[in-house]
């Protein structure tokens, strides 16, 4: 996060819903014994690019000023093809819309113009253990219209609450 906060001073500002792209290289600590990027590293790159979006947009001041905490609510990652050590890849972050509580993003992991993995997340903003209404933040940014998430994105997370409730009822 420190790197992102320093770099924000040298990068152009982006809109809160703008698609951004960052090129990375698969390093040796990203890999498993087969020298391909381990599944655990994909969420790290997804977090990085979401933080970059916050740092480079007006969301940074809206969130930091209020001492809010952006937090991941749920994610799904589809791995299609492996990425080998030392190879370059791009992470593309696209906004998939929002509702009154959640912000949805789609992350594409591209290499040689081919999608190697896709990560879909929903996140929210917390203050003192209470999810904060995004409406206030959007008003502060001057946003009058927001994009609703597509049905396929909503459907991915539809059963989340029920899954957690059932997990809490299980016998240990």
Predicted regions, residues:
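Short, basic/aromatic beta-hairpin or loop at an interaction surface
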Residues: 61-70
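HotDog/MaoC-like acyl-thioester-processing domains
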Residues: 1-9, 79, 83-88, 94-172
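Residue-level preference for alpha-helix termini and adjacent loops
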Residues: 30, 36, 62, 76-78, ...
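Short, structured beta-strand/loop micro-motifs enriched in basic residues and often containing a Trp
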Residues: 71-75
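Generic structural detector for well-ordered beta-strands
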Residues: 23-27, 78, 124
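Short beta-strand/loop turn elements enriched in aromatics
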Residues: 48-62
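Catalytic strand-loop segment that frames the active site of acyl-thioester-processing enzymes
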Residues: 1-52, 157-172
């Amino acid at each position: 996060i420190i790197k992102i906060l320093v770099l924000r001073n040298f990068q152009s500002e982006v809109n809160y819903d703008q698609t951004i792209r960052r090129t990375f290289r698969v390093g040796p600590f990203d890999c498993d014994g087969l020298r391909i990027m381990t599944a655990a590293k994909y969420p790290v790159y997804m977090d990085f690019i979401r933080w970059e979006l916050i740092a480079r947009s007006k969301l940074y001041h809206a969130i930091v000023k209020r001492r809010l905490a952006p937090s991941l609510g749920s994610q799904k990652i589809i791995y299609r093809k492996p990425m080998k050590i030392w190879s370059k890849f791009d992470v593309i972050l696209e906004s998939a819309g929002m509702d009154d509580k959640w912000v949805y993003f789609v992350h594409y992991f591209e290499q040689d113009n081919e999608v190697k993995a896709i990560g879909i997340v929903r996140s929210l903003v917390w203050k003192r253990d209470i999810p904060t209404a995004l409406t206030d933040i959007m008003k502060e940014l001057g946003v009058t219209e927001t994009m609703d998430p597509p049905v396929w994105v909503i459907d991915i997370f539809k059963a989340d609450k029920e899954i957690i409730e059932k997990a809490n009822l299980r016998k240990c």
